[in-house]
Amino acid sequence: MSAPRYAELQVTTHFSFLRGASSCDELFEQAKNLGIEALGVVDRNSLAAIPRAYEAANNHGVRLVIGCRLDLDDDLSVLVYPMDRAAYGRLCRLLSVGKKRGGKGKCRLSWDDLVAYGEGLIVVLLADLADDLCALRLRRLKAAFADRAYMALSLRRRPNDQMRLFELSGMAQAAGVPTVVTNDVLFHVPERRMLQDVVTCIRHNCTIDEAGFRRERHADRYMKPPEEMHRLFARYPEALSRSLEIAKRCKFSLKELVYQYPEERSLPGLTAQQALEKMVWEAVPGRYPNGLPEKVEKALHHELDVVGRLQYASYFLTVNAIVRYARSKDILCQGRGSAANSVICFVLGITAIDPALFSNLVFERFVSENRGEPPDIDVDFEHQRREEVIQWVYDTYGRDKAALCSVVTRYRGRGALRDVGKVLGLPEDLTKLLSSQVWRWSEGVGEKQVKELNLNMEDRRLKLAFELANQLVGTPRHHSQHPGGFVLSHDRLDELVPIEPAAMNDRQIIEWDKDDIDIVKFMKMDCLALGMLSCMKRGFDLLEARTGEKYDLAAMPPDDPATFAMIQKADTLGTFQIESRAQMSMLPRLKPAKFYDLVIQVAIVRPGPIQGDMVHPYLRRRQGKEPVLYEKPQLENILKKTLGVPLFQEQAMRIAMDCADFTADEADQLRRAMATFKNVGTISKFKEKLVTGMVANGYDKEFAERIFKQLEGFGSYGFPESHAASFALIAYASSWLKCHHPDIFCTAILNSQPMGFYAPAQIVRDARDHGVEVRPVCVNNSRFDCTLEPTGKKNDKGEERFAVRLGLRMVKGLSNDHAADIVAARQDRPFASVDDLWRRAGVPAAALVCLAEADAFLPSLRLARREALWAIKALRDEPLPLFAAAAIRENAVIEELQEPSVALRPMTDGGEVVQDYGHVGLTLREHPMTFLRRDLSRRRIVTCAEAVRVRDGTWLETAGLVLVRQRPGSAKGVIFMTLEDETGIANAVLWVKTFEKYRRVVLSAGMVGIYGKIQREGEVVHLVAHRLTDLSHALASVGERNNAFPLPHGRGDEFHHGMPDDHRAIRKRPPPSNHDDDEVERIKVISRNFH
């Protein structure tokens, strides 16, 4: 007797967000184990899982039946399966129509929509009860879809379930609609039931105790083997066999999805390839005015040949058109990534770095014929003007042929723990406490940390919360839009993949993310935003206005000694790429003295080189402490620039090619295998080939294995050399601007917020340390952006000195429109009073409160915070007509200062500082630590400045506000902490044991005291932490009131993820309150993490 056969046609993956509880890979692996022949993936109103399901089906040898569950109006649900490519296109268009109609995250479709787009679709009705409504729907189904109409039979595990199936089967037979068995799978194994209950509760925003019948009523929605399905549906053998029948009828496969890039007609009468070649050769003299080097010419011919064979010319023309448009609108942009390996991209001006100077010209790192993947060019634009470029792409290529990729937002450790805790009914303060102990996105909280928090791990709900949170990590939560990854198509894009509206206006996204489109081989062009480009563009504009000289990234003064002297001292706060604490600790040791040193600096502080044990050998050789030896001349040619240490991906590929006889494509496969060896295990075959090849070419076997170990260590994290050079160019330009024009640099970076590693408070403090005068926000002198004001003084060179005037953008809660109204209203004359500003600018009182809390009335109107707030409360909507007429005749305003004077108690100095931080994000008054210094000195806690001056080996204790916690990706797990007090900054190093011992303090404290040993290595000074103390409570004594205001934090703190709030957003705020004298004012430090 033959084994029972069955195809499961109703499988919901976790891409039905907060419904399914298993991934595609888990489902297809289980299907293979159970002997199921095919799986029909039918997520709700979505094809989001299809690329992953396609990949999983190929990996496990189980056939994929592409489908979708449609929830129509009138509570009607059907399963649909496209039989061919044309039907698939219609299904994509149908979903796009519903998503456009429903708005973000929703899909609204009717029966008429289904009928209109239903040609070629098999439609399976999902019916619950055999009632009159079901009979009507069956008749309509049969009339519309004839032999493509079916009805599903599924167990609901309720009383009279068999009777329900019998009645449904009889009703379908009477209507001439065949039935098919489905199991309505939500998870692959029974053990996943609890997680499915949890995501259901998250979806309904309720606890597990409140869920009731919103949970599945039974635990039967797991995948079952064919034998079990035949046992359960023994009375319906035909319905079981029809599962295979439908699978056979649905012949469409994702491999039929032929993507065609739009044909670019840049030059009429020429093909895309001819146009590209013509444009490239015409652009050569501009890039190489002294003639094209033979090596570069050979590479250019090779690249054009490869592009021609792979038919990628149109792609290069599109990217070129986008870059040319940006430059025509004076938008600063620069290509990066592996595209910087391409001479074509350099010649056309897409990238700024000549790959002939900075790489081994391994074009296959960018485009490989054997890899079968399309190229991927990343171009960075000013983050504040990138939207102009995005809208130009939509307008040029058409909204039916252009869309952004989506990003699948997945659960991270902290979010998973928080949501699971809420579902299980754990107290909110407990879940906050637990989640605050999670460092990385994939990290959980272990039993040890729970015990340190004095919690009982024997508590069933607490233990269950950890188990379920670990299962939830990595599960899709919702779709969001890619930062700028565009997919363009020759034909309608919505016939390839469903399109939905993005959260932002005038944008649309496809349902698939960047990994999905790699599977189906769509080409993507990345229009990315880089804050430092906005900063540099603003800086160049200010510099041109001052000096008349025009600067850009490609024309910076080369190898400026003063700039590199500043870099060597690690005076790089605010610059690009070399501003992190890990980078700053490396700079005085590596001592970059020319541009290529900066390229190495950018690349070396990366997890790969650290894990590959390449940093210390390079530093020793650079300092002359270790000889630079090469086994063979081939290695010297490849590694000479990096002193015999492989730091870049191109070097790894060139070693394989020149020393082990790899082809260019094999070398690229080696690089890709290194990037995934932990998961795939394909690295072993390349190890044998590399070692054997090197030995055959005369290398010692031990040496060959050592080289492989180094390459293996940095494969997944190593920079392409030309990519590092692209970043180094911006790093150098930002450092040059900071070195020679610190006032312009400070202004530009403040006007480009949010961006960078540090908060405005640290940027302003650093500028003041460099002699820049910074002036407060002022209602009569501040524009929206920060500006430069002449001081009437001269610098050492006899040039005019300028002060930075903080702009209205710094005032939290003040909208852009209200700021513009204020600036426009004072064009003729300055404001004379609060009342004058209110009446002339026409802004609401809430905007005035924002200004008063930011102390913006003090500089010109001499009104302190409390006086200004009191004046705002005294404002009248309209004066009486008689007094108004008199005021007009007198050309005067009705001043609030004519009210009876009230003696308001002035705020304390500490209270003013707290208010500054709370409403401007920084203070130009005393540092908060100044008010605590006397108490700290009594405890023999020294200042940060004193700590960094003492001799090596000194034991001491210092304290400060926590600016940054950084955990570079190294095997040793060292953690950097940066503390700030009124005298400066101190850097602490925590080894793993210390971190684990004081984990709660490290992750939670806003102010810490650190006792440890000073370690000096040249100009690098670290405090190696031995003991940490949480001093956050001390900050409560700085002010007078109990309202907690956050001390602004840098985006560089790795513990906190995401972007800081845009303080320009309009927010509802309470009316100004009375400031009671006995209230306690407090600073609350919230730091953030940055990997």
Swiss-Prot record:
This protein's UniProt keywords: Cytoplasm, DNA damage, DNA repair, DNA replication, DNA-directed DNA polymerase, Nucleotidyltransferase, Transferase
Top-level taxon: Bacteria
EC number from the UniProt entry: 2.7.7.7
Coiled-coil stretches noted in the UniProt entry, renumbered to this chain: none
Compartments, record wording: Cytoplasm
Alphabetical GO biological process terms: DNA repair; DNA replication; SOS response
Gene3D superfamilies in alphabetical order: 1.10.150.870, Metal-dependent hydrolases
Entry function: DNA polymerase involved in damage-induced mutagenesis and translesion synthesis (TLS). It is not the major replicative DNA polymerase.
NCBIfam families in the record: polc, PRK05672.1
Name under which the protein is recorded: Error-prone DNA polymerase 1
Source species of the chain: Agrobacterium fabrum (strain C58 / ATCC 33970)
Source organism phylogeny: Bacteria, Pseudomonadati, Pseudomonadota, Alphaproteobacteria, Hyphomicrobiales
